[in-house]
């Protein structure tokens, strides 16, 4: 399309104002489409400018972009870029960050310098402060990743743009950042799922029957809110309903439990005591796996003899 995206517009800037501004820059506008606020009806700060051909688009990006906007109050600059209006999806671009620029370099000069060396350069943008003055740095975008990397090497320290040698570094476009962020989060979700499966396999007690019914090898395929929510065809996995799960009864009758414990203790004590009074003839074939640390019982007759002897002595 032979159109440009134009931003940095004030509410009073209408179609006639933009046509006059381009005419003073030596360009003829074919059509203008301003995006307006649905409530106030004023322009939303940006729009689309259609030119005669692609040559005019290239010329505006080189000669007009970044220049002062005629008749603008307060002072504004042309803010132009290639238009994606009417295209499906977002085009992927590869960017470089350019620093050590001088204040006289504008968007058009930045774009023209890099486009002269690499034809896939599609835009140049100077970073401005709140007052519209250059921060002496900017960004250039390429349609080819190969030429982006070549420019990083070939034009590192190059001169001819401003009064200083250029310093270049890689920069990620918003589209690539958004894609990379969503991929990293999906990877992180799957990684957390695998870690949870490993930990549950080796560190959770397996003798708890009420926990053994759960499947620890679950997958966390959550949708990141920042991702594109375009509907896609997916095969939904079967979900296990927990209506039939039995949960342990947490209520305990303490009194009844204590009585049961005491009764079992009395039975054990009686059984152990009874073992000492069994005649040796009944020990054949009998084994006992319980160990007793109770003191040996004193015979009743021995106790009476001991008491009698003590009384006589007295």
Swiss-Prot record:
Alphabetical list of InterPro entries matching this protein: Nucleotide-bd_a/b_plait_sf, RBD_domain_sf, RRM_dom, TSAP1, TSAP1_C
Main location as per UniProt: nucleus
Record-annotated RRM domain positions: 2-85, 94-173
Keywords: Cytoplasm, Nucleus, Protein biosynthesis, Repeat, RNA-binding
UniProt GO cellular component terms: cytosol; nucleus
Key word Endoplasmic reticulum present: no
GO terms for MF: mRNA binding
Localization per record: Nucleus; Cytoplasm
Pfam family, one: Trnau1ap
Any one GO biological process: mRNA splice site recognition
SMART domains noted in UniProt: RRM
Family: Belongs to the RRM TRSPAP family.
Job of this protein: Involved in the early steps of selenocysteine biosynthesis and tRNA(Sec) charging to the later steps resulting in the cotranslational incorporation of selenocysteine into selenoproteins.
Protein's UniProt name: tRNA selenocysteine 1-associated protein 1
Gene label: trnau1ap
